[in-house]
Amino acid sequence: MLSLKLPRLFRIDQVPQVFHEQGILFGYRHPQSSATACILSLFQMTNETLNIWTHLLPFWFFVWRFMTALYVTDIQNDSYSWPMLVYMCTSCVYPLASSCAHTFSSMSKNARHICYFLDYGAVNLFSLGSAIAYSAYTFPDALVCSTFHECYVALAVLNTILSTGLSCYSRFLELQKPRLCKLLRVLAFAYPYTWDSLPIFYRLFLFPGESSRNEAMLYHQKHMGMTLLASFFYSAHLPERLAPGRFDYIGHSHQLFHVCVILATHLQMEAILLDKTLRREWLLATSRPFSFPQIAAAMLLCIIFSLSNIIYFSAALYRIPEPELHEKET
């Protein structure tokens, strides 16, 4: 009878420092795991297991939402719905990339970095998908067709490219300058999100009368609140920082961060769908829908330059002497 032996787990002092997580003492996988061992760890309680499943299960939920939208949309003729489909597609990409990164990050030191480079690229692709949907459906009435509106997606593309580069670069500082590393990585994700959210800020704070007439704004507010909560968990490393070893398997900050991010995406999707439906007639009469070349160009530029960043920093891993990258300065 065929039987599979689950991989052995290790303590924090048994794995290289590049694999250490603040406040997590047990449940580490072998730092040179095979791909098979990584996949088997999906069904073993490690300190990464729930990190994987908290994005892998929602991935299938978002795929279902995307496929349902495809089924009811006349893709060829309904150009008004194209930005929504692009957004929903990118909402499937980032949870899958995150799950894969957490699954295979224990194959080697360099594999760990490359996995997260790809994860950062996927997050930024989702950021661009959000910007495209916001541009199409959520802009305040007073700013539709303004210069800001015309430049909004182009600058969102630039933001994703810079953000991918900055977040990848931050990994090279992870051991030598951990505080700077965390600061740069938070900044890398915060400023594209802030740019993407400017239309929502306008509607909330500068055009409150318009906001009160649109029920989508309640979902936008909930989305922002959940995103702030996700940012807190990502930055603070709570609760495990207060009780090292107590939350190694269940309840540590990265798991809570994943849950908050997924809930934020769900709320954001509901808000955009409501804006798309409630404002359809006005937007079609007032603004021009995105053309296919515009959407394709934005997505391709993001993908090409983000992949270029990932390839550049991945190659740099093999050019930098190992002690400089993987050992802490003394």
UniProtKB/Swiss-Prot annotation:
Give the record's GO CC terms: plasma membrane
Q: Which InterPro entries match?
A: AdipoR/HlyIII-related (IPR004254)
Q: What is its main location?
A: membrane
Intracellular or extracellular location(s): Cell membrane
Q: Which residues span the membrane?
A: 52-72, 82-101, 114-134, 142-162, 187-207, 254-274, 295-315
Q: Which residues form a coiled coil?
A: none
Mind listing the GO molecular function terms for this protein? steroid binding
Q: Which domain of life is it from?
A: Eukaryota
UniProt GO BP: oogenesis
Q: Which residues lie on this side of the membrane: Extracellular?
A: 73-81, 135-141, 208-253, 316-330
Q: What membrane topology does this protein have? A: Multi-pass membrane protein
The miscellaneous comment for this protein is:
Non-classical progesterone receptors involved in extranuclear signaling are classified in 2 groups: the class II progestin and adipoQ receptor (PAQR) family (also called mPRs) (PAQR5, PAQR6, PAQR7, PAQR8 and PAQR9) and the b5-like heme/steroid-binding protein family (also called MAPRs) (PGRMC1, PGRMC2, NENF and CYB5D2).
What role does this protein play?
Plasma membrane progesterone (P4) receptor coupled to G proteins. Seems to act through a G(i) mediated pathway. May be involved in oocyte maturation.
The UniProt entry's sequence similarity note says: Belongs to the ADIPOR family.
Protein name per UniProt: Membrane progestin receptor gamma
